[in-house]
Amino acid sequence: MKRNPNFTSLTQNYLFSDLRNRIAQFHSENPQHQVINLSIGDTTQPLDTSVAEAFSQAIARFSSPSTYCGYGPDFGLPSLRQKLSEKLYHGCVNAEEIFISDGAKVDLFRLLSFFGPNQIVAVQDPSYPAYIDIARLTGAKEIVSLPCLQENDFLPVFPENTHIDILCLCSPNNPTGTALNKNQLRAIVRYAIEHNILILFDAAYSAFISAPSLPKSIFEIPDARFCAIEINSFSKSLGFAGIRLGWTVIPKELTYEDGQPIIRDWKRFLSTTFNGASIPAQEAATAGLSTLSKLEAVHYYKENSHLLKTSLLKAGFQVFGGEHAPYLWVKPTIETVPYRDLFDFFLQEYHIAITPGIGFGLCGSGFVRFSSLGKREDVLVACERLQMTPALQ
């Protein structure tokens, strides 16, 4: 058996695995210090009671011969697909265009596998590292970096005379924490249509958007139905990080260059490769969508963002994002950070683990990402430490 040559293009360790190893090493060498880990975007708040009860009831039905069921529908429970159409998309996406899955990351892999190798894939720089790794694993012909710089409000800049097949676009963005407004997103959709680009729109953090002027879905731009696929997840909105449930939207109007509908092939693809997501998880998500606006977890994380942003600004750092996403994009100055390695600076001096911006791409150099998804008590300790000079730690 020959090794898949696509693995040769990957780094030895995935970014967050490497950070875990470095934190563990610091723990072993400095057991007297408590490290506050604000590096990885993992959730900490429990399920809402209504969601947990729906989950328990669904599981209980599997224990009785009279209510047991086997496989569910390949594309998801009709009740959940309909609820998503009504509650999140307000009718601009039909239930038949929504496909329930076991998470956004695996859907990204499925989609890039579905469209096949030798695609030219464009990604924002900085961006979630899984986009590039998955593109490489699925045999992308080329990966085009779209610089998202501070002086351009972190908007992607498209290179001239460069062909792109697929654009991975995330808003609210990981890692910058910034969100596209409707005019900005409309311009990208227009560019994609003019240049025959398919947009894979990652809306995993849309639940954090609170401003009516900011789109939660790319399909708030009507023309996006001709050029975009959207992926989303219940990991942050309902606390399903360890439960695994997401969805993909493929509009009926989206076609190949020969006019054939993509949704038809996607159904065939899923029927072969996927037997449907967990039924208890889907029933729990259906219950959660009924009370989505009342769920406390997102509000909790947004308050964490506010606390961190306030402390970081007082400590002299430049801070971006955090208002409509659970991430803060932080730029230390030479005066505040004498270290070359920003991860080591925060770990050694403040005993806080963050994600170095360079891990998200070359344009992330000089920045770090703070996650607000931690526990409040940890965030408060981090805020207190940030108010102290490093020498006093």
UniProtKB/Swiss-Prot annotation:
Keywords: Aminotransferase, Pyridoxal phosphate, Transferase. InterPro entries: Aminotransferase_I/II_large, DapL/ALD1, NHTrfase_class1_PyrdxlP-BS, PyrdxlP-dep_Trfase, PyrdxlP-dep_Trfase_major, PyrdxlP-dep_Trfase_small. GO terms for biological process: lysine biosynthetic process via diaminopimelate, diaminopimelate-aminotransferase pathway. Pyridoxal 5'-phosphate binds at residues 71, 104-105, 128, 174, 205, 233-235, 244, 275. The keyword Transferase applies. Homodimer. This is LL-diaminopimelate aminotransferase. It comes from Chlamydia muridarum (strain MoPn / Nigg).
